Amino acid sequence: MREKIKLESSAGTGHFYTTTKNKRANPEKLEIKKFDPVARKHVTYKETKLK
């Protein structure tokens, strides 16, 4: 089953994206480069728990 996750910016701006992932197929934490509109550049987003 796909679970909801939060991708939080490593730039420290507080910006985040929400998405889903299959935890059985990909148990490791997701780390992806995406655009941060607050910092106005591409930064690394790391998976955190969605509360």
From Swiss-Prot:
Entries under Pfam families matching the protein: Ribosomal_L33
Matching InterPro entries: Ribosomal_bL33 (IPR001705), Ribosomal_bL33_CS (IPR018264), Ribosomal_bL33_sf (IPR038584), Ribosomal_zn-bd (IPR011332)
Gene Ontology cellular component annotations, sorted alphabetically: cytosolic large ribosomal subunit
Positions of disulphide bridges: none
Keywords assigned by UniProt, alphabetized: Ribonucleoprotein, Ribosomal protein
Bias (Polar residues) ranges: 10-20
Chain spans, region Disordered: 1-20
An annotated GO BP: translation
Lineage top rank: taxon: Bacteria
A single MF term (Gene Ontology): structural constituent of ribosome
Family per similarity comment: Belongs to the bacterial ribosomal protein bL33 family.
Record protein name field: Large ribosomal subunit protein bL33
Organism: Nitrosomonas europaea (strain ATCC 19718 / CIP 103999 / KCTC 2705 / NBRC 14298)
Organism taxonomic ancestry: Bacteria, Pseudomonadati, Pseudomonadota, Betaproteobacteria, Nitrosomonadales
